[in-house]
């Protein structure tokens, strides 16, 4: 629509066909399972859901597989994928080139205007956009609150007994931010109720969420969405997989059992498990 400066683009084929960058199968899987070309009749878009700053697209891709795993008698493999289309800030945050003496997460960039007759690569730091409310006080070295603090919500699926430990793990980062001049820079919140915000969703890129996933996986991860132009962290979804509890129960026994009677009991005290979770959440948030 030229009058409103909007354009309607049909991108269905990107998600329902074997498009580069949107497909599910790598060369190794193709070789191992003897995977053929995409079965377009059994590939489709499952769901599209939009929020103010992002659209989530879930789609299924199906392939014939002559050497599929033994439990698969249909000789096919289907994959369900999710892709996110995210609107970046209208004005990019000022980027910061990485100082390699400091351990930053970073994004690689390329300078094609270099006079070295080749492209030069460099890295920009991944960081939250924290701006002081009172710039003059901040310049004087006083602790000030940020205009927009970092807020992590807890997943509605998080068991009530673990929520205090998750919150403590998130807010353990208040101290380091105070060293940088910000107070209350990071806040942990319970998810809003349906009455408070009926549209709240962990998929909404406006919210950073610590997700509690019902899974047999023993792990936790801390992925984030970053603006590739500036390195600004737009949101983060820390993922805690339920069975990671067992991993830390085992580590607690092996690493402290010789000197710690609590670790040698059949049932580890709840507060001990909670403190382990707290430390993992703090690690992933960091």
Where are these regions (language model features)?
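Zn2+-dependent metallopeptidase catalytic core
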Residues: 157-185
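Stable alpha-helical elements in mature extracytoplasmic
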Residues: 162-169, 273, 277, 281
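Active-site recognition of the HExxH zinc-binding catalytic motif
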Residues: 171-174, 231, 279-286
């Amino acid at each position: 629509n030229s009058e409103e400066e909007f354009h309607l683009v049909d991108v269905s084929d990107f998600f329902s066909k074997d498009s580069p960058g949107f497909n599910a199968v790598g060369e190794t899987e193709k070789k191992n399972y003897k995977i053929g070309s995409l079965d377009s009749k059994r590939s489709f878009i499952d769901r599209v859901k939009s929020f103010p700053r992002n659209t989530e697209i879930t789609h299924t891709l199906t392939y014939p597989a002559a050497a599929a795993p033994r439990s698969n008698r249909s000789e096919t493999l289907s994959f369900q994928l999710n892709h996110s289309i995210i609107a970046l800030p209208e004005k990019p945050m000022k980027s910061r080139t990485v100082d390699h003496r400091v351990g930053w997460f970073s994004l690689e960039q390329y300078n094609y205007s270099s006079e070295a007759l080749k492209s030069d690569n460099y890295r920009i730091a991944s960081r939250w956009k924290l701006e002081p409310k009172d710039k003059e006080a901040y310049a004087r070295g006083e602790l000030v609150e940020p205009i927009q603090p970092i807020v992590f919500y807890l997943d509605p699926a998080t068991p009530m007994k673990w929520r205090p430990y998750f919150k403590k793990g998130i807010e353990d980062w208040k101290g380091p931010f105070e060293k940088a001049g910000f107070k209350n820079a990071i806040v942990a919140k319970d998810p809003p109720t349906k009455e408070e915000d009926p549209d709240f969703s962990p998929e909404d890129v406006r919210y950073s969420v610590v997700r509690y996933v019902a899974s047999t996986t023993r792990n936790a991860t801390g992925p984030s969405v970053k603006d590739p132009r500036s390195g600004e962290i737009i949101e983060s979804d820390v993922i805690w997989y339920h069975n990671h509890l067992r991993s830390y129960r085992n580590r607690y026994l092996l690493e402290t059992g010789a000197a710690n009677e609590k670790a040698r009991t059949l049932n580890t005290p709840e507060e001990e498990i909670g403190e382990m979770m707290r430390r993992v959440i703090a690690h992933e948030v960091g």
